[in-house]
């Protein structure tokens, strides 16, 4: 009889023990964060209770206790056995019950108060803001998306990551995770990642939508938004993906059924469809750009076939491309009209992120470093059917030398792989692969179903602010009342809101305008949002950075 091997059992036992240790470590982190939240909440409550006991002054408004209550509630969620958090929460119940707002009845005849188009960072964040903070009826706020929740993030190249860092700082500071779309949540805590992948961030958004009990309808594409003369909108939608197949099958079986296209009626519309799924058109960049491949269509840089690539565009998308190609030991040449690796500004939206600069420095030290050519502007791409018998020729022209300003102590990357040329001289670059087009996105506003419902800035502004949709002070279309914009396409006074931590601060501005239009009292909600740094209506604080000495 052959003795039974115990090696497999030992491996299983070891794996189980490792998993148990990991689970316990995760639980301990949760308990530690819960304790920190309780201490922070108690420190907020203490002066308020002193004010209650002081008969010479008015009692604080119930809304002032809400932030502490949110912390105690979050602590209980992290550690259900935290009796101190439960005790502190019970002390506040009577105060908070007085604050429970009364929801006014609908002041219009539309079935929906708000339709939010897009279930990404902006759409989910605004859904939470409208229903949780401004007390709109969740059943009357509908979020639609032609894909899944977080669809654009699911389409990111597998190696692409957030350039803004996540860190769970809320329990210890007045700020919170830069990539969070709702106060009291943190992608860093949920995902255990500082620079999340697209798939990870989509998971965060899905879980947030579930926890917030948002009314989300996926695989539903908006084909038209039609303003009504007396206010409100008719929104035409069609099913996509599996929903479309099911609808078509049902329609084929029953000719008397409703057509595949359906219409929604809503008092307000928030356009939050983003940019990633709407790259610059194939003919809008330069002659021959239709021969190129946009970086947003790359599923994974590791599985991209071929070698010796030409990357057109040197901002974040282009730098992400060359960093990944270098990591895969693939030769590549980057062509950019601006040497963004030399640009230093007081706005994080107009210079490369520190995370990107670190990656470029690493790429330049790789075994196959990229060539960086700037200032060099591509004016044409052609197929090459002669000398190389296939492939592509990228024609570009050198621009005038630029003296980029930077701080006295700024650390610059090495010039070893950076190349310049004589102004006006033309060069040809050959590549056997379709050139990679990394020149940004046209965006859903300019190319989607609402492009006729916005006015645009006619080229005013620089960078992302050029040709931006024109908005009033509430991020409402200047052309179509009741239609609001949320997300990275928002801009004001030449300032762009392309990072999550920027555009999330406009959620409450939009929600406040809509809630007031629906007859809600919003003063307490606005105060709460200001306390959370989620109500940005003064842009003077956005126009300068610390620089080298604060």
Model-identified regions with their sequence ranges:
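FAD-binding core/adjacent interface of flavoenzyme oxidoreductases
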Residues: 110-111, 136, 207-305, 414-425, ...
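N-terminal Rossmann-like FAD-binding beta1-loop-alpha1 element of flavoenzymes
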Residues: 110-142, 310-326
């Amino acid at each position: 009889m052959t003795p039974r091997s115990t090696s497999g059992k030992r491996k299983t036992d070891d794996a189980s023990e490792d998993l148990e240790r990991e689970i316990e470590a995760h639980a301990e982190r949760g308990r530690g964060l819960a304790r920190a939240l309780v201490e922070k909440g108690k420190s907020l409550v203490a002066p308020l209770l002193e004010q209650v006991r002081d008969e010479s002054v008015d009692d604080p408004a119930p809304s002032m206790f809400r932030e502490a209550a949110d912390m105690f509630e979050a602590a209980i969620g992290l550690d259900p056995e935290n009796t101190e958090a439960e005790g502190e929460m019970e002390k506040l119940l009577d105060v908070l019950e007085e604050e429970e707002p009364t929801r006014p009845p609908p002041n219009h005849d539309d079935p929906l108060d708000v339709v939010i188009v897009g279930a990404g960072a902006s759409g989910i964040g605004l859904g939470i803001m409208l229903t949780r903070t401004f007390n709109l009826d969740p059943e009357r706020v509908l979020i639609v998306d032609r894909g899944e929740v977080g669809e654009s993030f699911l389409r990111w190249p597998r190696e692409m990551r957030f350039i803004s860092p996540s860190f769970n700082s809320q329990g210890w500071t007045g700020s919170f995770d830069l990539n969070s779309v709702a106060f009291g949540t943190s992608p860093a805590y949920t995902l255990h990642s500082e620079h999340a992948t697209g798939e990870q961030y989509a998971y965060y958004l899905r879980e947030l939508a579930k926890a917030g009990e948002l009314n989300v309808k996926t695989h539903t594409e908006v084909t038209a938004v039609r303003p009504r003369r007396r206010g409100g909108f008719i929104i035409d939608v069609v099913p996509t993906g599996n929903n479309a197949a099911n609808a078509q099958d049902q329609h084929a079986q029953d000719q008397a059924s409703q057509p595949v296209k359906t219409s929604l009626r809503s008092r307000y519309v928030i356009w939050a469809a983003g940019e990633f799924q709407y790259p610059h058109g194939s003919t809008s960049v330069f002659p021959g750009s239709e021969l190129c491949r946009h970086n947003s269509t790359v599923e994974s840089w590791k599985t991209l076939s071929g070698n010796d690539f030409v990357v057109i565009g040197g901002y974040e998308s282009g730098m992400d491309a060359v960093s990944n190609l270098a990591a895969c030991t693939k030769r590549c040449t980057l062509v950019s009209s601006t040497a963004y690796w030399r640009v230093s500004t007081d706005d994080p939206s107009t210079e490369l992120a520190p995370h990107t600069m670190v990656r470029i420095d690493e790429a330049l030290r790789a075994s196959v470093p990229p060539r960086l050519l700037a200032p060099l502007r591509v004016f044409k791409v052609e197929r090459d059917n002669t000398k190389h018998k296939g492939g592509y020729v990228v024609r570009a022209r050198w621009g005038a030398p630029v003296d980029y300003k930077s701080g006295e102590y700024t650390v610059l990357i090495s010039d070893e792989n950076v190349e310049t040329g004589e102004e006006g001289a033309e060069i040809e670059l050959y590549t056997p692969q379709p050139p990679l087009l990394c020149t940004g996105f046209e965006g859903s506003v300019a190319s989607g179903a609402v492009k006729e419902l916005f006015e645009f800035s006619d080229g005013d502004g620089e960078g992302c602010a050029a040709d931006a949709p024109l908005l009033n002070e509430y991020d409402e279309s200047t052309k179509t009342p009741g239609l609001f914009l949320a997300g990275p396409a928002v801009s004001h006074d030449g300032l762009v809101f392309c990072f999550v931590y920027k555009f999330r601060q406009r959620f409450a501005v939009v929600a406040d305008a809509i809630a007031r239009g629906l007859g809600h009292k919003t003063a307490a909600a606005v105060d709460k949002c200001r306390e959370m740094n989620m109500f940005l209506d003064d842009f003077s604080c956005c126009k300068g950075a610390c620089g080298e000495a604060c």
